[in-house]
């Protein structure tokens, strides 16, 4: 799973430098709206909505925005109707890419995704072409400064911990079954252990290590996809060596 830890590190640094709050809020509003539409507006009985609200609050979204998004999802307020569509394909160096979207215009979205993939050195594939390479998991990052690896493992084993990654210098990455993400969050909260980026993630079974040129192209493509208004999340099985990471960080 070392590739996952490195990719998490890259994404964290990217988010710190180029996150656009307006774009982030748009994606969070869509997720809250869809979650409320699918599972109802009460977060206590809707784990997806509860996670979406927690993520929105962690990113300083005002409660008024959250409540309006919930009401649009439940039909109490008028608003756009979003459809969830997942696209699959390949990127530079042969990496697999999964693109999750939420859109009110399927034709616009597929044209945009196809254009971005083609321009970025990738190509769209058929449904299922790369999805089989990934497993959906719960993922949480816990600062190393907050707890030791042994104590964290002991704390979370009964709550649903599946794997604890410790390759990152600053964070442990906790992986769980999707249904166990909420119990693991609760265990951390009750123990007073801080955590970040609790989310549902797509974890690849294997990784493709890229050289500098392909890694640069892949990051540029993923960045372009993530900046599309209709894209909610992008997953890949890219990996890179420490030396490649160092080169890219200096650019």
UniProtKB/Swiss-Prot annotation:
<dbReference type="InterPro" id="IPR017856">
    <property type="entry name" value="Integrase-like_N"/>
</dbReference>
<keyword id="KW-0963">Cytoplasm</keyword>
<dbReference type="GO" id="GO:0003677">
    <property type="term" value="F:DNA binding"/>
</dbReference>
<comment type="similarity">
    <text>Belongs to the TACO1 family.</text>
</comment>
<keyword id="KW-0805">Transcription regulation</keyword>
<dbReference type="InterPro" id="IPR048300">
    <property type="entry name" value="TACO1_YebC-like_2nd/3rd_dom"/>
</dbReference>
<dbReference type="Pfam" id="PF20772">
    <property type="entry name" value="TACO1_YebC_N"/>
</dbReference>
<dbReference type="GO" id="GO:0005829">
    <property type="term" value="C:cytosol"/>
</dbReference>
<dbReference type="Pfam" id="PF01709">
    <property type="entry name" value="Transcrip_reg"/>
</dbReference>
<dbReference type="InterPro" id="IPR026564">
    <property type="entry name" value="Transcrip_reg_TACO1-like_dom3"/>
</dbReference>
<protein>
    <recommendedName>
        <fullName>Probable transcriptional regulatory protein CT1665</fullName>
    </recommendedName>
</protein>
<dbReference type="InterPro" id="IPR002876">
    <property type="entry name" value="Transcrip_reg_TACO1-like"/>
</dbReference>
<dbReference type="InterPro" id="IPR029072">
    <property type="entry name" value="YebC-like"/>
</dbReference>
<dbReference type="InterPro" id="IPR049083">
    <property type="entry name" value="TACO1_YebC_N"/>
</dbReference>
<keyword id="KW-0804">Transcription</keyword>
<keyword id="KW-0238">DNA-binding</keyword>
<dbReference type="GO" id="GO:0006355">
    <property type="term" value="P:regulation of DNA-templated transcription"/>
</dbReference>
């Amino acid at each position: 799973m070392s590739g996952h830890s490195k990719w998490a590190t890259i994404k964290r640094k990217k988010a710190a430098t180029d996150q656009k709050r307006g774009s982030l809020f748009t994606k969070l509003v869509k997720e809250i709206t869809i979650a409320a539409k699918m599972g109802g507006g009460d977060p206590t009985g809707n784990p997806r909505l509860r996670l979406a609200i927690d993520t929105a609050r962690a990113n300083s979204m005002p409660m008024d925005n959250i409540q309006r998004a919930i009401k649009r999802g439940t039909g109490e307020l008028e608003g756009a109707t979003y459809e969830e569509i997942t696209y699959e394909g390949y990127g530079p160096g042969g990496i697999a890419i999964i693109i999750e979207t939420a859109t009110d215009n399927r034709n616009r979205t597929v044209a945009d995704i196809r254009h971005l993939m083609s321009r970025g050195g990738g190509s769209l594939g058929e449904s299922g072409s790369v999805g089989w390479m990934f497993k959906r998991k719960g993922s949480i990052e816990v600062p190393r400064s907050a707890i030791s690896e042994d104590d964290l493992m002991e704390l979370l084993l009964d709550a649903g911990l599946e794997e604890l990654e410790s390759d990152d210098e600053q964070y442990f990455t906790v992986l769980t079954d999707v249904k166990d993400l909420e119990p693991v969050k609760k265990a951390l909260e009750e123990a007073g252990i801080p955590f970040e980026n609790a989310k549902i993630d797509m974890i690849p079974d294997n990784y493709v290590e890229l050289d500098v040129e392909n890694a640069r192209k892949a990051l540029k493509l993923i960045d372009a996809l993530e900046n599309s208004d209709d894209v909610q999340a992008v997953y890949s099985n890219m990996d890179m060596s420490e030396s490649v990471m160092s080169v890219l960080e200096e650019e």
